[in-house]
Design a protein with these regions (language model features):
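A Rossmann-like FAD-binding core segment of flavoenzymes
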Residues: 1-37
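Short, small/polar residue-rich loop motifs at catalytic or cofactor-binding pockets
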Residues: 12, 48-49, 117-119
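Flexible, acidic loop-helix segments that line cofactor/substrate-binding pockets
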Residues: 68-82
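Flexible, glycine-rich terminal cap/loop adjacent to redox cofactors
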Residues: 79-89, 94-180
């Protein structure tokens, strides 16, 4: 992107766009001050993942001594549809044995009720456990939490298959992916 002027976006290729809304979220820098020995820093100041929910987990760990798994911090892009992911990606698993299962959102009755059929639910599994999830869908951020609970608690695929998922819901897409 080269410039934004009068609601017209000019790309480096010279192409112009006239979007309704623009969200620019790049180039963030922490509002840093001098670090003090013996003081723990959280959030952007810690220089790690710049997500509010990550900063909250850091604060809870420091104040309540409740640990968390840094490899299970969810990421979400809020839009229509939402994009959410956690854990490993396929490229992280290259050279390893793993299984990929995918369910199209359009296969779910709830998506037709909501007129929101775009997207998919993708699960990556190893040794009967979910190691990664990627969701593009309405409510993707909420769906991801269900998967995070399973990952955090080492719940197996077979155990998840025992759960009754309500119909019609987006959640049943997770259930269907367990059988693929």
């Amino acid at each position: 992107m080269e410039k934004i002027e009068n609601n017209i976006v000019t790309l480096s290729s010279g192409e112009t766009l006239n979007p309704e809304l623009i969200l620019v979220a790049i180039g963030r820098e922490p509002n840093s001050q001098e670090k003090i020995d013996g003081v723990s820093y959280i959030g952007d100041e810690a220089g790690e993942i710049q997500l509010a929910h990550y900063a909250i987990k850091q604060a809870i760990e420091k104040t309540e001594n409740i640990p968390y798994r840094k490899d299970l911090i969810p990421s979400v892009v809020y839009g229509e549809p939402e994009i959410a992911w956690v854990g490993k990606r396929e490229q992280d698993l290259e050279g390893e044995e793993y299984k990929k299962s995918m369910v199209l959102i359009s296969a779910l009755g709830k998506s037709h009720c909501d007129n929101s059929t775009e997207g998919f639910i993708k699960l990556l599994t190893q040794e009967d456990k979910i190691v990664g999830a990627h969701i593009v869908s309405k409510e993707a951020s909420s769906l991801l939490q269900q998967i995070l609970i399973a990952m955090q608690n080492n719940i197996t695929i077979d155990q998840l298959k025992e759960i009754c998922f309500a119909h019609p819901t987006y959640s049943e897409g997770i259930f269907e992916a367990l059988f693929k």
